[in-house]
Amino acid sequence: MIDNNISNIVFSSTAAIFGNPKTKKIKECHKKSPINPYGKSKLMVENMLEDFAKAYELNVTCLRYFNAAGAHCDSHIGEDHNPETHLIPNVIKSTIHERDKLKVFGDTYKTYDGTCIRDYVHVTDLARAHLLALKMMEKHNGMFQYNLGNSDGFSVMDIIKSCERIIKTKISYTIEPAREGDPPSLIADSSLAKEVLGWNTKYSDIDNIIKTAYEWHKKQNLIKNKN
């Protein structure tokens, strides 16, 4: 960055840096105690960037995604990991491909239905946050961190029920042992991003988020069937 005269950077961080939160909604100042390698690696980079910002007078914004979800509204860009580990695409795939059996990891968490609760934020809302962060750093210098989510939590079972409403089919699943390193609940307090960046989510309804993901997966399946 220094060699190329670049002074602003936006880093894609994660809610996983907080570990098991002590409050229902997580503010930026919450203690960072990651419990899995992913969260630890992201926190390590945040700390490195803070050191670089001080040493080289760089401007750094860390955007802490909660659960990124959904697809572009025109269904051209969507979520396709291999192997897939994210809940929403796995639920959808289980209805499209019989071989992709849905597994629910843990049903004895201390939540209202025993399954993990997460805060889902649409990918295009996250993209807008990046643009707003870059614009903000044109006027302000330093190190900034923002939690990005809808500030509303949905359990694994809530997501399955939402998918059933969207896809209009009953979804079968098996209960598997809980995965080590999965906090029971992660919900963002995104008030700082709203106040400073002027950021608001356009996709606040979980059914609308899932609908964009389903339309993308459906389109991909149709394309594959044609080939």
Tell where the protein language model's regions lie, with residue ranges:
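Structural signature of the Rossmann-like NAD(P)-dependent dehydrogenase/reductase core
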Residues: 9-13, 61-64, 119, 147-149
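C-terminal substrate-binding subdomain of Rossmann-fold SDR/epimerase-dehydratase oxidoreductases
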Residues: 90-227
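A conserved hydrophobic position in a structured secondary element of the catalytic/binding core
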Residues: 13, 26, 188
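A short helix-coil junction within the Rossmann-fold of NAD(P)-dependent oxidoreductases
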Residues: 1-8, 136-140
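Active-site proximal helix/loop that lines the substrate pocket
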Residues: 14-17, 70-73, 109, 153
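Catalytic helix-loop patch of NAD(P)-dependent Rossmann-fold dehydrogenases
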Residues: 3, 7-8, 17-62, 67, ...
